C-alpha cells in the first residue's frame, strides 16, 4: 500500500497464502502453469484488518471448540489478525497453532497469554520478586507469546521486575 492510494484496475498474485505481487493494470508477470485466476472486476480488495485488543472467548470453561463463531465473525468483517492481551495461555496458543496449521478456521492469533495480574482473578501469575517475573515470562514465551501483559501490579518494584525480566528474556511488555 502507498498511503491512501487506490488502484482502480490492478492485479494481485498470491503464492502459498502470501501476497507476492501487486500491480496496476493487467498482470505484468507470468503466472505459473496451472495457476488459478479469479476475475474480480467491479470488486474491492483491501488488506486485512488487525484487532489489537481482542478477547475472543478462547477460555470459555476450558473448552476449545473446533469451530469458533467469533473467529468466523472476525473473518467475515475483514479482521484477519487479532491480539488478545489477557487469556488462558494453554488454550489460546493451542488455537493459534490450529489456525496456523489449517486445522481450524480463524484469524491469525497473537496473545500475551496469561496476564501478570497483581490482584485476584481467574488467570494470573503472582510476581513477588525478580525470579517470579523471570519464571512467568519464560513460561509465557515458551507457549509462543512475543509479549506479556502486566496489569494491576500493586508495587512499582513489581512492575520494574517484570520489565527487567522481559528485557533479559527478549519479550515485550504490554503495561496497564
Where are these regions (language model features)?
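Divalent-metal coordination cores built from histidine and acidic residues
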Residues: 40, 44-45, 49-57, 66-175
Amino acid at each position: 500500500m502507498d498511503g491512501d492510494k487506490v488502484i482502480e484496475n490492478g492485479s494481485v498474485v498470491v503464492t502459498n497464502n502470501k501476497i507476492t505481487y501487486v500491480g496496476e493494470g493487467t498482470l505484468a508477470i507470468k503466472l505459473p502453469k496451472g495457476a488459478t485466476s479469479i476475475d474480480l472486476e467491479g470488486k474491492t480488495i483491501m488488506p486485512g484488518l488487525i484487532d489489537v485488543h481482542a478477547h475472543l472467548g478462547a477460555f470459555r470453561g476450558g473448552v476449545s471448540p473446533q469451530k469458533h463463531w467469533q473467529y468466523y465473525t472476525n473473518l467475515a468483517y475483514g479482521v484477519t489478525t487479532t491480539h488478545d492481551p489477557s487469556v488462558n495461555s494453554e488454550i489460546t496458543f493451542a488455537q493459534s497453532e490450529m489456525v496456523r496449521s489449517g486445522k481450524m478456521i480463524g484469524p491469525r492469533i497473537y496473545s500475551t497469554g496469561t496476564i501478570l495480574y497483581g490482584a485476584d482473578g481467574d488467570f494470573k501469575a503472582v510476581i513477588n520478586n525478580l525470579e517470579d517475573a523471570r519464571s512467568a515470562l519464560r513460561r509465557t514465551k515458551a507457549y509462543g507469546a512475543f509479549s506479556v501483559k502486566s496489569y494491576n501490579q500493586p508495587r512499582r518494584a513489581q512492575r520494574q521486575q517484570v520489565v527487567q525480566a522481559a528485557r533479559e528474556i527478549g519479550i515485550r511488555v504490554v503495561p496497564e
